[in-house]
């Protein structure tokens, strides 16, 4: 049955003319029948997968628009060059990202009666908090809240906060949002030569940004809370972000994942 293991771990259902991209027991049953004429019940398929060491997991999604050449260029040349620049100038490297945390984003599970889906009542209102944060390989974390949408001027304000708090040159790595390399940012860098460098990750590659883990961590915590107003939510968000900020080892762990290990301190 090695071919089943290879099919599931190395491919996806679309390679077998299915419309779906996730392996479910139903899809695997159909694939077995379609490809090899093997008919098994769902329970039998489940036992077979367990024997093969396979378990149901929440997948990581990566864009098919990723350019592998650009990814290699960043990992093999761009980032090593930025790291060398940091070593030479004493600069501190930060990875930056923005996110919106919403009241209707719920995560986690709860115990309940078998066969009945538990109901958790909330206000039904929708409100959110917008944030920007930055993390460094040595465990530093900075964050800020803002109203409205992020733009070049707001991004520059955050860069200035990073520069002042660092007390030395900074290298900031962000995604390819237009305001990350627009005129306000270019003007700000020109006004602080040698003090602020802004670089960009390859397009469609959020997994390379360790700061993504700030949001994963924060949303996992906040998704379990009862937030009845925007005031309550802001207080909870600030408390959660401060908790992450004060946990240096947690922030360092964001750089120890498979896709972020390249940026860890050597």
Outline where the language-model segments fall.
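Short functional hotspots at interaction and active-site rims
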Residues: 1-266
């Amino acid at each position: 049955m090695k071919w089943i293991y290879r099919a599931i771990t190395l491919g996806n259902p679309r390679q077998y003319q299915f419309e779906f991209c996730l392996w479910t027991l139903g899809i695997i049953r159909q694939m077995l029948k379609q490809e090899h004429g093997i008919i098994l019940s769902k329970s039998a398929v489940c036992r077979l997968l367990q024997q093969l060491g396979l378990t149901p997991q929440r997948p990581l999604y990566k864009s098919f628009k990723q350019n592998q050449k650009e990814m290699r260029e960043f990992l093999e040349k761009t980032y090593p060059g930025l790291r060398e620049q940091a070593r030479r100038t004493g600069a501190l490297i930060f990875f930056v990202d923005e996110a919106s945390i919403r009241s209707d984003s719920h995560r986690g599970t709860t115990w309940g009666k078998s066969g009945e889906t538990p109901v958790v009542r909330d206000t039904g209102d929708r409100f959110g908090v917008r944030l920007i944060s930055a993390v460094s390989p040595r465990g530093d974390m900075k964050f800020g809240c803002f109203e409205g949408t992020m733009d070049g001027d707001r991004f520059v304000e955050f860069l200035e906060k990073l520069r002042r708090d660092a007390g030395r040159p900074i290298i900031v790595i962000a995604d390819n949002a237009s305001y990350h390399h627009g005129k306000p940012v270019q003007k700000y860098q020109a006004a602080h030569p040698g003090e602020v460098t802004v670089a960009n990750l390859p397009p469609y590659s959020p997994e390379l940004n360790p700061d993504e883990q700030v949001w994963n961590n924060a949303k996992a915590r906040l998704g379990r809370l009862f937030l009845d107003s925007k005031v309550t939510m802001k207080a909870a968000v600030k408390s959660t972000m401060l908790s992450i900020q004060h946990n240096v080892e947690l922030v360092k762990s964001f750089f120890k994942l498979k896709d972020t290990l390249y940026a860890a301190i050597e």
